Structures are given as structure tokens and as C-alpha cells.
Amino acid sequence: QKELVTHVYHTICHSRKLFIEAPTGAGKTISTVFPAVKAVGEGKADRIFYLTAKTIARTVADRTFDLLRERGLHFKTVVLTARDKICFMEESECNPDSCPYAKGHFDRINDAIFELMTTKEHYSREEIEACAQKYKVCPFELGLDMSLFSDGILCDYNYVFDPNVKLKRYFDQGEPGQGYLFLVDEAHNLVPRAREMYSASL
């Protein structure tokens, strides 16, 4: 693990790419997250994107940040959940006429953001849903807004690589990915996903 941590840190310092292949249980998550967090703390990067194809991998990464926080780390992270999974309505129609959470959303969103910012460092799906229910705001939009105040964003590949879904607030301004670290979990899964993203169907 020590050797892996060193390689990851040097890769970040020299703005390079690193591919890691190691067996399950080798400690890849902590060995990549720790040097990335260190680099952000030293001002070598602004934000970490931890990208996964599966929810379980996101959960493991989430727990890794929690372990570091238990040992004194102050680092805000948000877990982004797909709109159709986190929406409170049976059918997600994002307009004020059909969704009570969309109606008046912008009147209440600042209070919701302020509460999370001042009371939490970990914005999990459960925390976001609870706060969204309390202030009656859209949980999906609340998660996206909390990402602006987070040092680490845990999300699906789509939010970075899919041209239709990518987070435009980060990737449509200036040089793409400037100041960001991308930790891509199980990168072999990205190939078939990328094919889907860039394939059209009639």
C-alpha cells in the first residue's frame, strides 16, 4: 500500500495518468483516496471526483472518506444519486405545476444548503433526502448544489463522461477538468459504458 500511495501522489504532482491493477482487498481505495486528499490539502488540486459504475463501489469510497474523518480529516464530500432514484415523486416531472418540491424550490434552497454546510461534512443520499424533505426542495438539485461546497464528489461515470449528463457547472467552462482529480474505480467498466454514451439509437 505504501508503494501505491507514493505512486499515486507522484502521479498527481506531475499531472500524469496512472492505471492500477490489483486484486480485491489490496486496499486500492484508501491507497488512492489518501494521496488525493493530501494533494488537495496542499493546494495541488481543487476537488476530487471519485467515479464508479456501481452503487456498492460508491459506498466503499464513501466509507473510506468516513474513516479518514474519524481520524481528524476535515473534508466535505457529497454522494450524487441519479434523479430517478432520489426523486420523491412517483413520476419525476420537474416543473412547479406537477411537483411540490419544485414549486418554490428557489425560495427555500438557500436555507437547506446552509443547514447542511454548517452541520455536516458528509452529504450522503440519506442526509440530502432528509434535508430536502425538511425544507421541501428537490433532493436531486440539492445534491448538485452541495457539490459546489464539497471537496470530494462521489458519483457515476455519467456525470463526467456522458456528454448529455455531465455536470456542466464543472465541465463547460474553460479547460475541462482543470484543477480536478479523477479517481476512476474499475476503469474497465468505462469502455462499455462509453460505447453506450456515444452511441445513437433510433
List each language-model region with its residue ranges:
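Generic beta-sheet signal
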Residues: 16-20, 46-48, 152-155, 180-182
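Alpha-helix capping and helix-loop boundary segments enriched in small/acidic/polar residues
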Residues: 20-27, 52, 56, 198
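Walker A/P-loop NTP-binding motif
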Residues: 9-10, 29-43, 64-68
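Signature of the SF2 helicase/ATPase Hel1-core->accessory helical subdomain module
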Residues: 32, 59, 63, 135-152, ...
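Walker A/P-loop
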Residues: 14-34
